[in-house]
Design a protein with these regions (language model features):
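Solvent-exposed alpha-helical segments within well-ordered globular domains of core cellular machineries
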Residues: 19, 23, 38, 42, ...
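Loop/helix-junction capping segments adjacent to catalytic residues or to phosphate/diphosphate-binding pockets
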Residues: 34, 62, 97-98
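Conserved nucleic-acid-binding Ia/Ib motif block in the N-terminal RecA-like helicase ATPase lobe
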Residues: 82-131
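Walker A/P-loop NTP-binding motif
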Residues: 41-47, 60-81
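Conserved pre-motif I regulatory segment
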Residues: 2, 6-53
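Active-site phosphate-binding and catalytic loops of NTP-dependent enzymes
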Residues: 34, 52-53, 76-81, 116-118
Length: 131
């Protein structure tokens, strides 16, 4: 698990992201990322299973969605052969699922990719009852 630190006064950029994503990040006002966000994205793109913990507003969700968008946009060959990029982002709050799906579509604008937001947060107690 990667724990997001509270020292977020420095920012950096990721130059190795697909060009379309970099343009869409700038258009969305997300060109300057925190060091922690860059580390989350780096680990995600390296293929590490990424579980992130941190305070509200730390940018965890944004970083993970950027990672998903980067992988999806870099998978052009897969898209051309009809294979969809794989990924699953589980949230505890329905609002986060909606925000993640909307941000993904904004960051992949022009690619034709779509996202669906799914949250299991409110269903967990019901699932435990069924067991």
């Amino acid at each position: 698990m990667w724990t997001v630190s509270y020292a977020q006064n420095t920012s950096m950029t990721l130059d190795n992201l697909p060009e379309q994503l970099q343009k869409n990040l700038e258009a969305a006002g997300l060109a300057d990322l925190t060091v922690d966000q860059c580390e989350i994205i780096r680990r995600f793109l390296a293929g590490e299973r990424t579980l992130v913990s941190g305070h509200d507003g730390a940018g965890k969700l944004t970083a993970l969605v950027i990672g998903f968008a980067a992988k999806a946009l870099a998978s052009r060959r897969s898209l051309e052969t009809g294979r969809l990029p794989e990924g699953l982002l589980i949230t505890n709050h329905p609002e986060d699922a909606i925000v993640a799906a909307a941000l993904f579509e904004r960051l992949t604008h022009g690619s034709g990719l779509k996202a669906a937001g799914v949250s299991i947060g409110r269903n967990v107690p019901r699932m435990r009852e069924i067991e």
